[in-house]
Amino acid sequence: MLKKINFIDINWNKVDNMLPVVIQHNLSGKVLMHGYMNQEALKRTQNEGIVTFYSRTKQRLWTKGETSKNFLYVTDIRLDCDQDALLIFVRPVGKTCHLNHVSCFQVPSENLFFLHDLDCMLKFKKHYGLENSYTFNLHKNGVNRIAQKVAEEAIETAISAVSKNKVELINESSDLVYHLLVLLHSYDLDLYDVIKNLKMRSNKQV
């Protein structure tokens, strides 16, 4: 259940009843867009679980995706320490920017964002890849073949490490990560299932 922000905790007077809001992808952490909410917009956002802004251009409430259907489903809402801005984590449908970009902020993809994008792309190719797609055909050949490739790449990674060949170590490690992601997808798992497990382990004493 979505944890709601208490309206009395917000310093509405400080922001002239127009609260700045940053929208962030709940998995990748990528900043998607920025907007404003009045009290009515925040109330609807919390009640419906879909981001609704107050559009200063349209002079009305505006639900992101009301035309494109690229809605932003809320997973968490956080109020900043000065009680005058919101950070909303979302599960986006499609691309957020009206110019057909993932984010309204066009910045170079950070390394961790790339891993998220790669994970999503490989997951997509499992179901919708072309016949000449290596990823699609791996899934077509079944989990045993994928597992075999993971084992092969793991051995080759170990050999390159023992031989102290850094270039090959990077290349083989890349192959290993790729095939491991494909293997996870074959069981309807993904990168974030592994991250969740690693976070849980990190909280335990070693």
UniProtKB/Swiss-Prot annotation:
Pfam families registered for this protein in UniProt: PRA-CH, PRA-PH
GO terms for MF: ATP binding; phosphoribosyl-AMP cyclohydrolase activity; phosphoribosyl-ATP diphosphatase activity
Organism: Buchnera aphidicola subsp. Baizongia pistaciae (strain Bp)
Region of interest: Phosphoribosyl-ATP pyrophosphohydrolase: 115-206
SUPFAM superfamilies assigned to the protein according to its UniProt record, in alphabetical order: all-alpha NTP pyrophosphatases, HisI-like
Pathway: Amino-acid biosynthesis; L-histidine biosynthesis; L-histidine from 5-phospho-alpha-D-ribose 1-diphosphate: step 2/9; Amino-acid biosynthesis; L-histidine biosynthesis; L-histidine from 5-phospho-alpha-D-ribose 1-diphosphate: step 3/9
Enzyme class (EC, first level): hydrolase
Subcellular location: Cytoplasm
Classification lineage: Bacteria, Pseudomonadati, Pseudomonadota, Gammaproteobacteria, Enterobacterales
Biological process according to GO: L-histidine biosynthetic process
GO cellular component, one term: cytoplasm
Reaction(s) the record says it catalyses: 1-(5-phospho-beta-D-ribosyl)-ATP + H2O = 1-(5-phospho-beta-D-ribosyl)-5'-AMP + diphosphate + H(+); 1-(5-phospho-beta-D-ribosyl)-5'-AMP + H2O = 1-(5-phospho-beta-D-ribosyl)-5-[(5-phospho-beta-D-ribosylamino)methylideneamino]imidazole-4-carboxamide
Signal peptide residue numbers: none
Region (Phosphoribosyl-AMP cyclohydrolase): 1-114
Primary localization class, coarse: cytoplasm
Name of protein: Histidine biosynthesis bifunctional protein HisIE
Listed PANTHER family: HISTIDINE BIOSYNTHESIS BIFUNCTIONAL PROTEIN (PTHR42945), HISTIDINE BIOSYNTHESIS BIFUNCTIONAL PROTEIN HISIE (PTHR42945:SF9)
Keywords: Amino-acid biosynthesis, ATP-binding, Cytoplasm, Histidine biosynthesis, Hydrolase, Multifunctional enzyme, Nucleotide-binding
EC numbers for this chain: 3.5.4.19, 3.6.1.31
Family membership: In the N-terminal section; belongs to the PRA-CH family.
Protein biosynthesis among keywords: no
